[in-house]
C-alpha cells in the first residue's frame, strides 16, 4: 500500500494502529492494524513476530506527539488455519498489555455482524502507512486510497483466492495490513497483491471470521 493514495487528514482515523515488529530473525518490520476494542488490535497474520509494539494516536510515525499511546502486545492470536504459503486466513488479533485510553485521537472501529456480505461495485477505502509507489519505501504519514470491490473472477489468476474468505479489490501495495472501510465499517484486512502493484489485490474478508473473532475476544 498505498499506491495512488493521498495523505489522511491527521487523526481523522483514530482507530489506526502502527505496529513495530521484531521478527523471528531479529529484524524490524512494520504493519498497520486497527483498534477493535480497548484491549485488542486486528491486523494480518503475516505481521506476526517475536515481539510487537503498537502505537495508537499516530499520524506521522517518525514525529512523536502527545497523542501517542505506545503499548506492548502480550499475546498474538494468529488464526489457527493461517497458511503462510497460500496466505489464506490472513488475520490476527493482538492483545494489548494495558487497555488503550479512548481520546479524540484514539478510538475503536466497529465490526459488523457476521451476516454482512458486500456486493461487487461498492467503493471502499484502504488506510495505512504502506508504500506510496513501487519505488518508494513505506510512508511515514497515514495514507488512504479509494478502491472498488471487483467481481471474484478478477482475482482468479491468484491460485489461492477464495471469494468466501477474501475480497478482490482494485490495488494497494504490500507492507500494510491496514483496514478496508466500506461505509465506515471494517470489511477487510490488506493481505497481498502483485509484486509490481498492478491491480487487483486481495483482502481478508472480516465477516467470515466473526465466530473466531468473537471467541477470542470472549475468552480473553
From Swiss-Prot:
Glycosylation site positions: 101
GO biological process: proteolysis
Molecular function terms from GO: serine-type endopeptidase activity
Active-site residues from the entry: 46, 90, 177
UniProt EC number: 3.4.21.39
Gene: CMA1
Pfam families, sorted: Trypsin
InterPro entries to which the protein is assigned, alphabetical: Peptidase_S1_PA, Peptidase_S1_PA_chymotrypsin, Peptidase_S1A, Trypsin_dom, TRYPSIN_HIS
Annotated Gene Ontology cellular component terms: cytoplasm; extracellular space; intracellular membrane-bounded organelle
Family, per entry: Belongs to the peptidase S1 family. Granzyme subfamily.
CDD domains from the UniProt entry: Tryp_SPc
Keywords: Disulfide bond, Glycoprotein, Hydrolase, Protease, Secreted, Serine protease
Disulfide pairings: 31-47, 124-182, 155-168
Reactions catalysed, as given in the entry: Preferential cleavage: Phe-|-Xaa > Tyr-|-Xaa > Trp-|-Xaa > Leu-|-Xaa
Domain Peptidase S1: 2-218
Biological function: Major secreted protease of mast cells with suspected roles in vasoactive peptide generation, extracellular matrix degradation, and regulation of gland secretion.
Subcellular location: Secreted; Cytoplasmic granule
Full protein name: Chymase
Enzyme class: hydrolase
Amino acid at each position: 500500500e498505498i499506491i495512488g493514495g493521498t495523505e489522511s487528514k491527521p487523526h481523522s482515523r483514530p482507530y489506526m494502529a502502527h505496529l513495530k515488529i521484531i521478527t523471528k530473525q531479529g529484524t524490524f518490520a512494520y504493519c498497520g492494524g486497527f483498534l477493535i476494542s480497548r484491549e485488542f488490535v486486528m491486523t494480518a497474520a503475516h505481521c506476526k513476530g517475536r515481539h510487537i509494539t503498537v502505537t495508537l494516536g499516530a499520524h506521522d510515525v517518525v514525529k512523536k506527539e502527545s497523542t501517542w499511546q505506545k503499548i506492548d502486545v502480550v499475546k498474538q492470536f494468529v488464526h489457527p488455519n493461517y497458511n503462510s504459503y497460500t496466505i489464506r486466513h490472513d488475520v490476527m488479533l493482538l492483545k494489548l498489555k494495558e487497555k488503550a485510553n479512548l481520546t479524540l485521537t484514539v478510538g475503536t472501529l466497529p465490526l459488523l455482524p457476521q451476516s454482512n456480505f458486500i456486493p461487487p461495485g461498492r467503493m471502499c477505502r484502504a488506510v495505512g502507512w504502506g508504500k506510496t509507489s513501487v519505488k518508494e519505501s513505506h510512508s511515514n504519514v497515514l495514507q488512504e486510497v479509494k478502491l472498488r470491490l471487483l467481481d471474484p473472477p478478477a482475482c482468479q489468476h491468484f491460485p489461492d483466492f477464495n471469494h468466501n474468505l477474501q475480497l478482490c479489490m482494485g490495488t494497494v501495495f504490500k507492507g500494510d495490513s491496514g483496514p478496508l472501510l466500506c461505509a465506515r465499517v471494517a470489511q477487510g484486512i490488506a493481505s497481498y497483491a502483485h509484486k509490481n502493484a498492478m491491480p487487483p489485490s486481495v483482502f481478508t474478508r472480516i465477516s467470515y471470521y466473526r465466530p473466531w473473532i468473537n471467541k477470542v475476544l470472549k475468552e480473553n
